[in-house]
Amino acid sequence: MMSISNKRSIFSWMVLALASTVMLASCASANKAVSVDSFSKEDLWSFNGEKKIYGVLYRPDGIKKAPLLIVSHGIGSDHRSGAPYAEALVKLGYAVYCYDFCGGGRASRSDGKTSEMSIFSEEADLAAVIDMFKNVEGIKKGKVTLLGISQGGMVSALYAGDNPKKVEKLVLVYPALCIKDDWVTKYPKITDMPEVVNSFGMQLGRAYVESLYDLDVYGRISNYKGEVQIIHGDQDHLVPISYSEKAHEAYKNSSFKVMPGAGHGFRGKVQQEAIEIIKDFLMR
């Protein structure tokens, strides 16, 4: 028969365990960073109209309602480019979703042709993904944090500017805010552009360019007044750092970190440094 002292010990242990669980859930629900030792991965599909969107959800173990962070990849890439960020940030207690834009890359598992893709079709993909999470169990309802890489940074910035009340925080990693200037300079009129051009190892159509002419990039993205973290290499020859400098000036509440010697595309030590910057930003 169990002694009274043993019963009290077990009861005390149960109370402590319950308190720890409540504290962990409370921290996650408040969008505060917590330390998570393990996580799971699962395939998760959504729809933009009739087009299927593929992605991978990283879930932190032990958190009942995890705040959502969505990673958007660059042109020609796919969800795998977000994996290093997801594997680090899920350990802060975030549910992290990396997905493939429709027509966004050669290895995309989502529907759609690259010749039909534009930054605005990708913004619609992002909106569809965010809407899908309203019905996913284990995800904290409300605002979402966005992390965009290169063209995914442009798309994330546009979405945040168009939907400022839906975004908790915004992280832009060498965001391709040069897209309008690059393409409109090359094709001053849409009729100057062939029906299809080869770029980034894929075929892009007029849909990619025709909606850029009237776009006020900085006027639109600066509608977002929340916290922004911008990270850019000073040796980026694909997207000059001046575009991020201008974004830093346009945003009301941004932090800007220059990565000395880094080009377009972070790897190894530089990528790890960028991840630490992002972690610090999310934890504050």
Model-predicted regions and their roles:
Residues 224, 230-232, 236:
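Short beta-strand/loop motif that positions the catalytic acidic residue
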Residues 158, 162-205:
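Hydrolase active-site cap/lid region
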Residues 81, 116-136:
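Alpha/beta-hydrolase active-site loop
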Residues 75-87:
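The serine-hydrolase catalytic nucleophile loop
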Residues 31-62:
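N-terminal cap/lid segment of alpha/beta-hydrolase-fold proteins
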Residues 262-273:
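Catalytic histidine-centered segment of alpha/beta-hydrolase-like enzymes
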